[in-house]
């Protein structure tokens, strides 16, 4: 049960990482420019989300003994 819960947490944060990367890609194209006048701040927020999610994934991997 513990392993399933940890794998679910890892999957959740892997999805958050992917979401942040997609958002950054959108900001790199004209679609996102009109909505966010401060693109640097918007991208920085996505990088912060990505890094937090990555740390969570790495933490779960460490707990499970699956460090990659």
Model feature map: region roles:
Residues 1-68:
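Extended, charge-rich alpha-helical interface modules
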